[in-house]
UniProtKB/Swiss-Prot annotation:
PANTHER family: GLUCOSE-6-PHOSPHATE ISOMERASE (PTHR11469:SF1). Pfam families: PGI (PF00342). PROSITE patterns: P_GLUCOSE_ISOMERASE_1, P_GLUCOSE_ISOMERASE_2, P_GLUCOSE_ISOMERASE_3. It is found in: Cytoplasm. It is an enzyme of class 5 (isomerase). The keyword Coiled coil does not apply. Catalyzes the reversible isomerization of glucose-6-phosphate to fructose-6-phosphate. Keywords: Cytoplasm, Gluconeogenesis, Glycolysis, Isomerase. Its EC number is 5.3.1.9. One of its GO terms (biological process) is gluconeogenesis. This is Glucose-6-phosphate isomerase.
Length: 430
């Protein structure tokens, strides 16, 4: 099964997923979501964002980016936690990566996603002698981690810039909340987190699009990839809809075959943060009422030298979902050395991408055939903006189906509020 951006395959030794037996349930969920007749209908705004995004707000985002570029801003500090930063961080790493030949037009530094004094001080020191701007992202403005970071970076910016308000953008609620009120009082530029879009589904709003534009990522291409993927996932037929097929396969492995863990694997280090975004998406959407697969991640072949032994010979509690690259933009072809000191001449005329692909196939065979670890493999097209948007949409559509198959609300996260309540109590917040 494939789309323009993603091809799925299943290597499930001695197991056949009865996809068609789930068709009635899948159709019911599909039609309920499509008609917005589900109880959680007020959280489905993300479904049509790729086609119906706010073009007036998008133009204002472009204007702000142009202003910052004109003013020679070097770094944009993106402050947020969870869904308020993971999508933007994922896109930034997907397009650029740490050592990419392609460089961002403004560097993004992500803050407010922990409460480490060491880390915050290091980031403040990193930007203090640079021309920097701030994009603070929070629907309420009361989440502790980003609030602390915003206060410290704001204080630093106000010391450096007379007109500091021109270099702060708040992405928040459209009419209420602590951050909205602060931004209004200080005359910061404001962009909106829509009421009908939850944090982990917000990457195609200003939450993700504005940081993308700051970095020089073509956000319209991201939206186009998401729109195209949405179009390709129109069918309610589980055999024709790749996202639903993935959702059914993981549901079957979990509920019928009793696998407890799904490990999201890639052979591309640039996907490390995509895995982090995926983990939040599935953990917060499914982990309720004592239900849900435990989402984990690994980068191969690196983690084969740590986790590989456990996956191969450890308890049979997990299956793998493996995302591999079809068209690398860069490659290396090995040549013979005159003297084969390193004994690598057997790789002569092979490309490094071929070696990586052999590692993938050898590992999948070892894990699935000998280790009895089921594998769901996905081949993604390239590291382009369009593919990025397509992957975002694919997994958001998949997790919605998967959570409803499990019988839980995909769009709330009541468990997250418990630690916040305890923390605020211990800190003496009134």
């Amino acid at each position: 099964m494939s789309s323009s951006y993603l091809k799925l395959d299943f290597k499930l030794k001695n197991q056949v997923v009865p996809f068609e037996s789930y068709q009635k349930q899948v159709s019911q969920i599909h039609n309920a979501v499509k008609s917005k007749s589900v109880e959680e209908k007020d959280w489905l705004g993300w479904l049509n964002l790729a086609s119906d995004y706010n073009k007036e707000e998008y133009a204002k985002m472009e204007e702000k980016v142009a202003q910052w570029l004109k003013d020679k801003v070097e770094v944009v500090v993106v402050i947020g936690i969870g869904g308020s930063y993971l999508g933007a961080k994922t896109g930034y790493e997907f397009i650029f990566g740490k050592y990419s030949i392609k460089k961002p037009q403004m560097e993004l530094v992500f803050a407010g996603n922990d409460i480490s004094a060491e880390t915050l001080v290091a980031k403040l020191n990193y930007v203090k002698d640079k021309k920097f701007a701030i994009n603070v992202i929070s629907k309420s403005g009361t989440t502790l981690e980003p609030s602390i970071a915003f206060r410290e970076f704001r204080n630093l910016l106000e010391q450096k810039e007379v007109n500091s308000w021109e270099y702060i953008v708040a992405t928040t609620d459209k009419q209420k909340g602590v951050l909205f009120e602060l931004a209004t009082a200080k005359k910061y530029t404001k962009f909106v987190i829509p009421d009908d879009v939850g944090g982990r589904f917000s990457v195609l709003t200003a939450v993700g699009l504005f940081p993308f534009l700051c970095a020089g990522i073509d956000a319209k291409k991201v939206l186009e990839g998401a729109r195209q993927m949405n179009k390709e996932l129109f069918s309610e037929n589980v055999m024709e809809n790749a996202a639903y097929k993935y959702a059914v396969a993981r549901h079957y492995l979990h509920k019928e075959k009793k696998y407890a863990v799904e490990i999201f694997v890639s052979y591309e280090p640039k996907l490390r943060y995509f895995a982090e975004w995926w983990k939040q998406l599935f953990a917060e959407s499914e982990g309720k009422d004592g239900k849900g697969l435990w989402p984990s991640s690994a980068i191969f072949s690196t983690d084969l030298h740590s986790l590989g032994q456990m996956i191969q010979d450890g308890p049979k509690i997990l299956f793998e979902t493996v995302l591999t690259l079809e068209n690398p933009a860069y490659d290396i072809t090995f040549k013979d050395n005159v003297i084969d000191y390193d004994k690598l001449n057997y790789l002569s005329d092979k490309k490094l991408s071929e070696v990586n692909n052999v590692a993938f196939n050898a590992t999948m065979e070892a894990h699935s055939d000998e280790g009895n670890v089921p594998n769901i493999s996905m081949l993604f097209k390239d590291f382009s903006e369009e593919t990025l948007g397509a992957l975002f949409m694919f997994f958001m559509r998949a997790v919605t189906m998967s959570a409803y198959l499990l019988g839980v609300n995909p769009f709330n996260q009541p468990g997250v509020e418990v630690y916040k309540k305890n923390m605020f109590f211990l800190l003496g917040k009134k």
